[in-house]
Amino acid sequence: NNVPATPWGAGTSTEGNPVPTFGGLVINMSRMDKILEIRPGDLQVDVQPGVLRKELNRKAGRHGLFFPPDPGADATIGGMIANNASGVQTVKYGATKDYVMKLTMVLPTGKVIHTGCKAHKSSSGYDLTRLFVGSEGTLGIVTEATLKLCGIPSHRLAATINFNDLESASGAVAALIGSGLGPAALELLP
């Protein structure tokens, strides 16, 4: 009926996206908050869009696993998918798009579709899953997702390094990445 629908998750709104600028309905997805199944042997989890990232990592952590994208705020998985959330760990782990394997979506017409698959490698057909990730809810609303998980690192080390200028800092970052140490997070603070 040409009524705009805007999905809303945890309201972290770091991007300002859940504002219905053209009127219409705001659909609160926060009660669709079930972790449907964790499959440790497959490094996968099935979730509803209202699951909070910290809650997912708490439950996956019981199996020695975690969902790496960390936008800073405790966003919902649906919001992270809608915005292709990333964070300081992107340098090693990538963004949300790198972990979404399968989606169940409701299109603006009301039609329910399934994209992707649970196989780690699939090269047949169009990659509709990647089309929806980062579309900010404009192409449809996520109602379920299958995500890849990673093993929790056995060791962690944090360091703060001061530099006199940006050139020295960027040179050190390039050297660190080139060394093969594989830092999980890097952040430049003024």
Model-derived regions, located:
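FAD-binding subdomain of flavoenzyme oxidoreductases
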Residues: K34-I38, V45-E187
